[in-house]
Amino acid sequence: MEKFLDINEIKKIIPHRYPFLLVDKITELEEGKSAVGYKNVTANEYFFNGHFPEEPVMPGVLIIEALAQVGAVAILSKEEFKGKIAYFGGINKAKFRKKVVPGDVLRLSIELTKIKGVAGVGKAVATVDGKVAAEAELLFVIGK
């Protein structure tokens, strides 16, 4: 099932807010299974002031966080988890393959590969222009 969520609809599902909300829209959502979202990376991002002033690069940890936020939308849209919070449980196999710079459009996709009770695992991939920028296996747990 494909679903489009704008920023206001995303904010109804996850608690993140500026400056830590790192997803602009969700273009595909299969509740409890997968999601695809986008982040428009602009020169005005707060983190570019210090990372790095002469060569701005989006920190890898924030790319992973953006992927986790898309994953949170996927799992928290499932009826039994609506109104709850998804917490990071861990990160495995993280790889950073391409710099993300101002002007890039970051495509963030996640497939939830295992859910057991309130814990689960997702395979996440961030791309720019079809090239992998980062990938990781994200572990999560659902809180109250």
From Swiss-Prot:
Cellular component GO terms held in the UniProt record: cytoplasm; membrane
Location in or out of the cell: Cytoplasm
SUPFAM superfamilies in the record: Thioesterase/thiol ester dehydrase-isomerase (SSF54637)
Location (main, coarse): cytoplasm
Entry EC number(s): 4.2.1.59
GO biological process, one term: lipid A biosynthetic process
Domain of life: Bacteria
GO molecular function: (3R)-hydroxyacyl-[acyl-carrier-protein] dehydratase activity
Keywords: Cytoplasm, Lipid A biosynthesis, Lipid biosynthesis, Lipid metabolism, Lyase
Catalytic activity: a (3R)-hydroxyacyl-[ACP] = a (2E)-enoyl-[ACP] + H2O
Keyword Iron-sulfur: no
Family: Belongs to the thioester dehydratase family. FabZ subfamily.
Function recorded in the entry: Involved in unsaturated fatty acids biosynthesis. Catalyzes the dehydration of short chain beta-hydroxyacyl-ACPs and long chain saturated and unsaturated beta-hydroxyacyl-ACPs.
Name this protein carries in UniProt: 3-hydroxyacyl-[acyl-carrier-protein] dehydratase FabZ
Species name: Clostridium botulinum (strain Kyoto / Type A2)
Gene (UniProt): fabZ
